[in-house]
Regions:
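Active-site proximal loops enriched in glycine and acidic residues that flank catalytic Cys/His/Asp
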Residues: 75, 88-91, 140, 193
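ATP-dependent carboxylate/phosphate-activation module, predominantly the ATP-grasp catalytic core
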Residues: 2-66, 70, 77-80, 86, ...
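Peripheral (often C-terminal) accessory segments that flank ATP-dependent C-N-forming ligase machineries
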Residues: 115-216
């Protein structure tokens, strides 16, 4: 399994932490154009499964000497022993709408918090994690270059709309995007819920049942 560790710091104090879970692994998603990749910002980062990654991320911040700013790291959990192995460590914000996912996981604003961390060291908002927020990135299918129809969305919104705060898809008539060059592909959606299982259930429906078609 592959994850992120993200943090905002001010004067050596950690103001906010996040762990996102990539579903499926990024390499698998890159090799299969029919997949709708997901990134889930988890509400509970104290879970035993991800604790080694959080611990190593905190140690990496100390080694880097990062006192103030935002950090984004990517790591995977070994299938053999559960060890956390880091593949990327950066003193930067994440891409791929992940910061927006963090916002939706706590009803806060990490962009504002980042600015406050640099300017004053104090936060004016609650950044308590309340929700699991799953980002789903869609890719059009079919032989054509132009979006001809979008299927399955209305039904899911009718049934689960309160737990789908973001729907930002291409419109019918637009040219499909090159998903190999754009992380968000032909648009993105968000499913969120306090319960992780419920979040994953809605996210899977958005990934599997919503289809963006280019009929040619």
């Amino acid at each position: 399994e592959e994850f992120t560790y993200d943090a905002i710091l001010s004067g050596g104090r950690t103001l906010f932490e996040n762990v996102a879970w990539y579903r499926p692994k990024p390499l698998v998603a890159r090799q299969n154009p029919w997949i709708s990749p997901q990134a889930i910002c988890l509400s509970d980062i104290r879970q035993d499964e991800i604790a080694p990654g959080v611990e190593l991320g905190r140690k990496a911040l100390q080694v880097l000497g990062l006192q103030t700013g935002m950090a984004h790291m990517e790591w995977y959990r070994s299938d053999k022993n559960g060890e956390a192995i880091f593949g990327e460590v950066g003193a930067r914000a994440p891409g791929g709408r992940l910061s927006h996912g963090m916002n939706l996981s706590c009803d806060g604003d990490v962009f504002k918090l980042w600015a406050e961390a640099i300017t004053s060291g104090e936060t004016s908002q609650s950044m308590e994690k309340r929700y699991n927020a799953a980002l789903i990135f869609k890719r059009a299918t079919g032989p054509g270059r132009t979006i001809t129809r979008i299927e399955g969305l209305e039904r899911i919104l009718a049934e689960c709309g309160d737990n789908i705060p973001v729907v930002d898809l291409v419109s019918v008539g637009e040219t499909r995007r090159d998903w190999t060059q754009v992380v968000t592909g032909d648009g993105w959606m968000v499913a969120r819920h306090m319960d992780l299982g419920s979040t994953l259930g809605i996210a899977n429906r958005l990934a599997q049942d919503v289809r963006i078609l280019c009929d040619g």
